Amino acid sequence: MPFVKDFKPQALGDTNLFKPIKIGNNELLHRAVIPPLTRMRAQHPGNIPNRDWAVEYYAQRAQRPGTLIITEGTFPSPQSGGYDNAPGIWSEEQIKEWTKIFKAIHENKSFAWVQLWVLGWAAFPDTLARDGLRYDSASDNVYMNAEQEEKAKKANNPQHSITKDEIKQYVKEYVQAAKNSIAAGADGVEIHSANGYLLNQFLDPHSNNRTDEYGGSIENRARFTLEVVDAVVDAIGPEKVGLRLSPYGVFNSMSGGAETGIVAQYAYVLGELERRAKAGKRLAFVHLVEPRVTNPFLTEGEGEYNGGSNKFAYSIWKGPIIRAGNFALHPEVVREEVKDPRTLIGYGRFFISNPDLVDRLEKGLPLNKYDRDTFYKMSAEGYIDYPTYEEALKLGWDKN
């Protein structure tokens, strides 16, 4: 793979991106964050982090000391999942492999946070049916799309509107997964309430048409997310917890900017987090997906939403904010955004193809192109074989 063409890098070493910041208990040496990157290399059966490659993959990207790494989305329980090749953190075998990964990250003097991920209607209903598991969402009468509805009915596993007892069970599973993460050596956890997965399905009025205390109003739609946050904070401490949100996202059939009340919904969540913070329970960070990337399967520049921005969050939430979405090819935007001293920048796809991305950002070096075809391929190719800048020069990539 050659370097990215028609891209003029800018050295960002003189910006706030390379100023230290404390996130929870972690003293980061810069503000370029690795956000959660699903890679589908976990081993089936068992949803076990890949024994052959995962340690090396994470160690490569932790090579710059003081880097914050948020792991790929990780299932708290079998019921949370529905993808065979994404990892979990409920079994002894899974925890054993995660322990090795966290150790490798820490040996490079970087930091490991686990993203806790529950799929809901984005799961494969036939995979869940095979394993005797429900196909869950906020409601049972609106599916993610026609294809998912057809799969669910064919598998005799129609979408299930989870009961209040089942919500309580999910909360317990988030708590146990957070405890497992910390026991395995992680520095913290990120609760995934973005990108159309289960917690986001409760936040969005398109997917949530419940009439109980978990639907029907901004406050009720936020209840499940906030219950998870509160329970996990009580279990491991607020300084070890972050929350991810995607106000304008349309991935997995979310409303995004088409929903007129969407900013009010997220402003309420952020306000509740700030209220808790003032009472002594400030989360380590809030992580926002930018309207620049409303759907992670689209390439840079596609699917941008221009009708709003995440700036509203800064006037409500007064803690650190990670912002992720199509920043790597726009260093001029990064230069402006990091002028706010609370801002960190998440770099996703280009951290896949550039294990030394932090060095390249600092010095303004060319970036390796990524190969989208290997994002979710069960192979070492496209996973642990991307070269550093020096290695790429030896391969002649600068001449391609």
UniProtKB/Swiss-Prot annotation:
InterPro entries: Aldolase_TIM, OxRdtase_FMN_N, Oye-like. SUPFAM superfamilies: FMN-linked oxidoreductases. The active site is at 197 (proton donor). One of its GO terms (cellular component) is nucleus. Its main location: cytoplasm. Its cofactor is FMN. GO terms for biological process: apoptotic process. It catalyses: A + NADPH + H(+) = AH2 + NADP(+). FMN binds at residues 38, 115, 244, 349. It comes from the Eukaryota. GO terms for molecular function: FMN binding; NADPH dehydrogenase activity. It is found in: Cytoplasm; Nucleus; Mitochondrion. Its EC number is 1.6.99.1. Keywords: Cytoplasm, Flavoprotein, FMN, Mitochondrion, NADP, Nucleus, Oxidoreductase, Phosphoprotein. The modification Phosphoserine is found at residues 353, 379. Substrate binds at residues 192, 195, 376. Belongs to the NADH:flavin oxidoreductase/NADH oxidase family. Present with 15100 molecules/cell in log phase SD medium. Homodimer or heterodimer with OYE3. Flavin-dependent enoate reductase that catalyzes the chemo- and stereoslective hydrogenation of electron-poor alkenes. The enzyme is reduced by NADPH, and oxygen, quinones, and alpha,beta-unsaturated aldehydes and ketones can act as electron acceptors to complete catalytic turnover. The physiological oxidant remains elusive. Has an antioxidant activity, reducing reactive oxygen species (ROS) levels when overexpressed. Formation of OYE2-OYE3 heterodimers contribute to the induction of programmed cell death upon oxidative stress. This is NADPH dehydrogenase 2. It comes from Saccharomyces cerevisiae (strain ATCC 204508 / S288c) (Baker's yeast).
